[in-house]
UniProtKB/Swiss-Prot annotation:
GO molecular function: cysteine-type endopeptidase activity; cysteine-type peptidase activity; endopeptidase activity; protease binding
Family: Belongs to the peptidase C14A family.
Protein name: Caspase-12
EC number from the UniProt entry: 3.4.22.-
Length: 420
């Protein structure tokens, strides 16, 4: 039927032309603003071509049924240019957010936070129309190019007015922050993780931009990982540092991070307790009262972490342990301190469930984590950034996982203040 109509009178041809012109304009803007690179644009273009091709077949079907149905469908497509819009942040965004976080009154601050969340949601709603045409894998791994920096005035204001609520942050001059990345890519018995190089490079770049000197160790057994952690904990630079990051990327099971010799018959696993023990206040005094952030990209089981739920309400129960009896001893010659404080662990999935990666784009968790750090760490504290990452996984998709915040013993808020 399509062959009988000329291009000049063919509504399908007109719609395809309109859609192509509109998408070309959007893609040009995305390239100009460095939102997409050439490879990403090519992948999106392939997805858009597929959608246009499928849309042509669908519209043809409507025209064969009735002329009116075709007009209705064509009208909706023709009006799509009003929906396909991107809202970019204004130049005074930083000033607005600084006002929002200025500690005046609790009610005023809360109101401004709600306003900011509304603005962010509006921007997401507009952008989502374009994202509908992007393949799932590209959506999930798209990362903002540059780290947004914190102004000097904002840094000084927060350090002064919220000194009792936040962890002390040292001045850049003389500060010797260290971060450790352990990544296992080659395994004796498990599948290799060749695409993990993307995660290593992106995490290294992020941590360096945050002021950390990054140590990278690859392809270690559990015992070798423990040895490297002990060496890192003993580094003298921690004395003149205000925090540290420990990043683990490997295969994993519920009990911990897999070493390169792991197999079911003979496990090779670095347990969480081992990590926390090495860096606790007793064994790593240089990092006492300083934030110790653990990032773990690894599966924690083989389940997908999704279920089908009904609208009926269920009842949850939990068992409780008996009360622990504590004995207090006083000694005038020493100061009592908690064995484990100032830790937070952010893991890529819930217990028993898997973590996803998408080819050479790296893992979903690491890419979302880096994206949220680049967007929000100039103004949000660490736990709020982690919640932003969790929010990005809130709606289950084809690749489903839910990052979890665990073993939190931080007593204050930790701000990174990038650029300071």
């Amino acid at each position: 039927m399509a062959a009988k109509r000329t291009h000049e009178r063919d509504p399908i041809y007109k719609i395809k032309g309109l859609a192509k012109d509109m998408l070309d304009g959007v893609f040009d803007d995305l390239m100009d603003k460095n939102v997409l690179n050439g490879d990403e644009l090519l992948k999106i273009g392939e997805g858009a071509s597929l959608i246009l091709s499928k849309a042509e077949n669908l519209v043809e079907s409507f025209f064969e049924k009735t002329e009116m149905a075709g007009k209705i469908f064509a009208g909706h497509i023709a009006n799509s240019d009003k929906q396909l819009s991107l809202q970019f942040p204004s130049d005074d965004e930083e000033d607005e957010l600084q006002k929002m976080f200025t500690p005046s009154s609790a009610s005023e601050s809360r109101g401004k936070v709600e306003d900011e969340e509304m603005e962010v949601n509006v921007g997401v709603a507009h952008a989502s129309h374009l994202m509908l045409t992007v393949p799932q894998g590209i959506q999930s791994t798209e990362v903002q190019d540059s780290l947004k920096l914190c102004s000097r005035d904002w840094f000084c204001t927060m350090k002064t007015e919220r000194a009792e609520e936040i962890y002390p942050v040292m001045e850049k001059e003389g500060r010797t922050r260290l971060a450790l990345i352990i990544c296992n890519k080659k395994f004796d018995y498990l599948f290799d993780r060749d695409d993990a190089e993307t995660d290593i490079l992106n995490m290294k770049e992020l941590l360096q931009n945050l002021g950390y000197s990054v140590v990278i160790k690859e392809n270690l057994t559990a015992q070798e990982m423990e040895t490297e952690l002990m060496k890192f904990a003993g580094r003298p630079e921690h004395q003149s540092s205000d925090s540290t990051f420990l990043v683990f990327m490997s295969h994993g099971i519920l009990e911990g991070i897999c070493g390169v010799k792991h197999r079911n018959k003979k496990p090779d696993v670095l347990h969480d307790d081992t990590i926390f023990t090495i860096f606790n206040n007793s064994n790593c005094p240089s990092l006492r009262n300083k934030p110790k952030i653990l990032i773990m990209q690894a599966c924690r089981g083989r389940h997908t972490g999704t279920i089908w739920v009904s609208t009926s309400k269920g009842i949850a129960t939990a068992d409780t342990d008996e009360e622990c009896v504590l004995s207090h001893r006083w000694n005038n010659s020493i100061t009592k301190a908690h064995v484990e404080t100032d830790f937070i662990a952010f893991k890529s999935s819930t217990p028993h469930n898997i973590s996803w990666k998408v080819g050479k784009s790296g893992s979903l968790f690491i890419s979302k984590l880096i994206d949220c750090f680049k967007k929000y760490c100039w103004c949000y504290h660490l736990e709020e950034i982690f919640r932003k990452v969790q929010y990005s996984f809130e709606v289950p998709g084809e690749l489903t996982q839910m990052p979890t915040i665990e073993r939190v013993s931080m007593t204050r808020y930790f701000y990174l203040f990038p650029g300071n």
